[in-house]
Amino acid sequence: MKGEIYMIVVRQRDEKDCGVCALLSIIRHYKGNVPLEKIRLDAKTTNEGTTALNLILASQKYGFEAMGVKLNSIYDIKQFPAIAHMNLKKGYTHYVVIEKITKDKIFIMDPAKGKVVMKVNDFICEWSNVVLLFYP
């Protein structure tokens, strides 16, 4: 098992808030706390949501080193928690926090649904191969 951790669930109130809620969950995981509204402002969230770059830049304001990477395999993720960028079947993009990965399951904190366990193959069908990594 990789990355046995416990993530704090931060539920989104708005469709556009998945990215900032995922970032707030990362911040709280490392014992920080920033008001969601401040993260929205710092990440330049619009009615379309938040870009990966703006999530990275906002996290740097809170003391994180962060980077976005495009990976060939979900198993290439070595730093947990990580934010995954998703392309949902309904045509929306979405962000979730990966807590851990096993051989056939992925444990995530989904700002829209809470704690979710997915089959790796199902996750891969919606994953854009992009993850955001954070180092406190």
Label each PLM-derived region with a short phrase.
Residues F134-P136:
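Cytosolic-side membrane-insertion boundary helix
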